[in-house]
Design a protein with these regions (language model features):
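Hydrophobic residues in well-ordered beta-strands that form the structural core
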Residues: 5, 38, 75, 138-140
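Short, solvent-exposed loop/turn segments at secondary-structure boundaries
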Residues: 14-18, 85-89, 148-152
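Short, hinge-like loop/turn segments at secondary-structure boundaries
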Residues: 54-57, 132-133, 154
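A conserved catalytic-core segment of Leloir-type glycosyltransferases
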Residues: 38-108
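An aromatic- and histidine-rich active-site surface loop
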Residues: 87-98, 110-132
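Generic structural signal for helix capping and beta-alpha/helix-loop junctions
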Residues: 13, 46-48, 83, 122, ...
Length: 154
């Protein structure tokens, strides 16, 4: 099965501990014969902004395309403001990323999309799933419950 994995959290060349729970899932899927591609949208930010959270380490200078193990990863940038005061900015950014993802996949089309984390990656998953008329599902993690459900802006 062709599976597209979308996640805000995935190991980066300079932060291999970031999002290992997602890469473990991807490795398991490939080990049982699935064809998996990974999209890791990253927020546009300056190096000093990485200090806000350990999971942001390496984001500012991460390449747009890289390999983690045997998996090719596409890491397009999106616009978003801390605290999400204007989520429409991020939603518009995800619309542009959808076009970049389609171009990067170069004719490869998934049969399903697996989305790790909800905001804002679910916006991208939903848009791509509608475009290709395929199902998508979300794997919800702690931050989605602890923070995301309480955020009145998203």
């Amino acid at each position: 099965m062709r599976i597209l994995v979308l996640s805000l959290m995935y190991p980066l060349p300079t932060n291999v501990a970031r999002g290992t729970f997602v890469s473990d899932n991807v490795e398991l899927l490939t080990s049982i014969g699935h064809d998996v591609k990974v999209i890791n949208p990253l927020p546009r930010m300056l190096k000093y902004q990485e200090a806000r959270r350990s999971t942001l380490t390496g984001v500012a200078k991460s390449p747009k395309k890289f390999k983690h193990g045997e998996i090719e990863v596409f890491a397009p940038r999106f616009w978003g403001l801390p605290g999400h005061p204007y989520p429409s900015i991020t939603i518009r950014s995800m619309k542009k990323i959808a076009k970049k993802v389609t171009a990067w996949l170069d004719g490869w089309q998934p049969e399903i999309i697996v989305c790790h984390t909800i905001w804002p990656v679910a916006e991208l998953a939903n848009r791509l799933a509608k475009q290709w008329q395929i199902p998508w599902l979300s794997v919800v993690h702690g931050h989605d419950f602890d923070v995301g459900l309480q955020d009145s802006n998203i």
